[in-house]
Amino acid sequence: MVVTFQHVPVMVAEVVAALAPRPGGRYIDATVGGGGHALAVLQAARPGGRLLGIDADPAALVATADRLAEAGLREHAVLCHGSFADLAVIAGETGFINVDGILFDLGVSSYQLDTPERGFSFAADGPLDMRLDPTQGPTAADLVNTLSERELADVIFQYGEEHAARRIARAIVERRRTQPFQRTADLAAVIARVVGGRRGRIHPATRTFQALRIAVNRELDRLAAALPQAVHLLAPGGRLVVISFHSLEDRIVKQFMRAEAEGATPRLVINTKKPVAATDDEVATNPRARSAKLRVATRIV
């Protein structure tokens, strides 16, 4: 039975063009999600292509296995539960070194956002969780109910780029004195009272929820740790492809690629001087592609 893991992968054609899969090539999808990119890469790498798929969410791996099995490609993929911060260890244990391409599709899947029980969304009430890996670490409720007012304000400002961070943190602390936060709708309502109505299409809780998700999953730290490992695992000529969804991620990727392309012994050449965006047609059918930015670099030594 196929797991209900609904996720539309972004920029599939652009990813395949960037990775340029070849028959017999070996690839790593460090954020395999529902397997949409993995399927396209393996189809382009026939015959003989192999892929290592990694994801922190066990449900994503089940969905990917089902998707690849339906296409007759399951035996060409190794699927591992884990964090891409441990990329080198996972790749070493599975024999995926000197690979031809590595993909990072950052952010949260449609399934995670649209499943209230995962606690990522302010649009539907659910437990205040937000863990990409539901078996690991503190939840968003843990952070909201235990961090000091200053720590909360710092998280919301730094990771959410929310200018009302101090006022939001103050309101959270005042409210939790009498009743701890447990539900997403409860937190969203408190934020909305502080910030006010929608900012155009943006819900007033958007930036705070993003900040908490990043903090819960240590997303930026793990990305910064994973990128050097990825370069080390690439064979000369191998491609590093990264899709980011907000400025904090994109800044880390941009600065990393630039640093690796400069200096006395550069290891990368940058293929995308400016990030590639989704086409208007794709955004029309998949609005979550609107903020996607794709960057590509090639290993040269």
Curated annotation (Swiss-Prot):
InterPro entries in the record: RsmH, SAM-dep_MeTrfase_MraW_recog, SAM-dependent_MTases_sf
Binding site for S-adenosyl-L-methionine: 35-37, 55, 84, 105, 112
Protein keywords: Cytoplasm, Methyltransferase, rRNA processing, S-adenosyl-L-methionine, Transferase
GO molecular function annotations of the record: rRNA (cytosine-N4-)-methyltransferase activity
SUPFAM superfamilies: Putative methyltransferase TM0872, insert domain (SSF81799), S-adenosyl-L-methionine-dependent methyltransferases (SSF53335)
GO biological process per UniProt: rRNA base methylation
PANTHER family reported in the protein's UniProt record: 12S RRNA N4-METHYLCYTIDINE METHYLTRANSFERASE (PTHR11265:SF0), S-ADENOSYL-METHYLTRANSFERASE MRAW (PTHR11265)
Family: Belongs to the methyltransferase superfamily. RsmH family.
Protein name: Ribosomal RNA small subunit methyltransferase H
